[in-house]
Amino acid sequence: MIDYILLIISTALINNFVLVKFLGLCPFMGVSKKIETAIGMGLATMFVLTVASLCAYLVEHYLLTPLHANFLRTLIFILVIAVVVQFTEMVIHKTSPTLYRLLGIFLPLITTNCAVLGVALLNINLAHNLTQSVIYGFSASLGFSLVLVLFAALRERLTAADIPLPFRGASIALITAGLMSLAFMGFSGLVRV
């Protein structure tokens, strides 16, 4: 049990996919202008990452490895992720049309979010079992969602701030992301990985 807690902490905080591994930067910068949108994108990504980790483990161990088709891993994982994203998109469209409109093009772009594919491939490379794969996917999405919501809150505050003209827009957003990355580096001594 303690191993799973350490896996959650190390994946969500210490080895954060956005601030440490630099995966998932497109939705991080694109959807982080409003907190409501960031929360919706975080929840959608959380669902997709967790389910995609489960599906990728099952496909790897029950389809690709027995058939010695490991060379197709990336292609098959992209197809699995696309199916999971389509399912998520249909659910959000039926349950919350407002959130569906707010997320816009970024919802189908979860398919090409490199963090989702990165988690699936890292699960295989780290030789996680089924439980560890699901927890790793959930933890990565938890860290992604946490950073996304915190960054959206900071960007909302920045819109009200008096920022010099050369730093407005993407410049101050990148500076803020860099400062967040420095803050998350403070967690690096928390757990030995």
Swiss-Prot record:
Its top-level enzyme class, in one word, is translocase
Question: Can you tell me which family this protein belongs to?
Answer: Belongs to the NqrDE/RnfAE family.
Q: What is this protein called?
A: Ion-translocating oxidoreductase complex subunit A
List all membrane-crossing ranges.
Answer: 5-25, 39-59, 72-92, 102-122, 134-154, 171-191
The record's annotation in NCBIfam families points to: PRK05151.1 (NF003481), rnfA (TIGR01943)
Q: Give the InterPro entries listed for this entry.
A: Ion_transpt_RnfA/RsxA, NqrDE/RnfAE, NqrDE/RnfAE_oxidrdctase
Does the keyword section mention Cell inner membrane? yes
Major place of residence: membrane
Enumerate the Gene Ontology biological process terms: electron transport chain
Q: Which organism is it from?
A: Histophilus somni (strain 129Pt) (Haemophilus somnus)
- What is this protein for, i.e. what is its function? Part of a membrane-bound complex that couples electron transfer with translocation of ions across the membrane.
Query: Which Pfam families does the protein's record reference?
Result: Rnf-Nqr (PF02508)
Its gene is rnfA
Q: Where located?
A: Cell inner membrane
Subunit details for this protein? The complex is composed of six subunits: RnfA, RnfB, RnfC, RnfD, RnfE and RnfG.
UniProt entry keywords in alphabetical sequence = Cell inner membrane, Cell membrane, Electron transport, Membrane, Translocase, Transmembrane, Transmembrane helix, Transport
